């Protein structure tokens, strides 16, 4: 018997979930829910029902798990606790500083409804979290380092696009080479958030938007840009489509530690 899956939100993440379902014989895509006109959504799977997001509760007894593919900035903090009242839910909430708060909200809703809520199971937090866990088990005396990029952060790009005056935008997370090399060399440096990464934004403005105001909102945004050296470029919509239409990304989880009676052996575990 297959597990019946619903997908809430059909962007890049939603399509990725659809591809993953195809590779698992015990999963079945039952329905896709969207805030767009359902008739405008073309799924990769044939004969899958596409519904308005507002109709999702009508599927309460037809879906076993609802996977939420919205953004962490404004969608998931509202959606995950709300839909946990009706479904078992999974999300990839990735605003690290707000995970305890998000956990409490989802936990309360799921316990009250008798459902299961699984949060923050994306890339990081998610896969990278698992790699940190096993590396810590192997090298208990050591330090963790995580570097993201160079690549597009969909969460940060989504946060940019929600600013008034922004028509579209992409954000690249870029590791600081000197910091990365110091870690790989086993130097165990003490690094601030700002010393590990820079952020580069390519933004298309709405007509009449205040460029300086938008730039300030980006650079001072808590949990996203305020702790980083951030560069904002204003470009045309055509430039964005031509040069920044992809969503490549990468990253490195590194555990540097020592073993031996006198801690005489140095080791580095790296996952990318």
Model-inferred region functions:
Residues 13:
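Hydrophobic/small residue at the entry helix of a nucleotide-binding pocket
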Residues 8, 16, 134-256:
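Active-site-lining helix/loop region of Rossmann-like oxidoreductase modules
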Residues 93-117:
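Rossmann-fold NAD(P)-binding glycine/threonine-rich loop
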Residues 1-5:
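Extreme N-terminal starter segment of soluble prokaryotic enzymes
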Residues 247, 253-272:
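Peri-transmembrane interface segments
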Residues 23-44:
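NAD(P)-binding Rossmann-fold cofactor-contacting core
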Residues 56-65, 73-92:
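Rossmann-fold NAD(P) dinucleotide-binding segment
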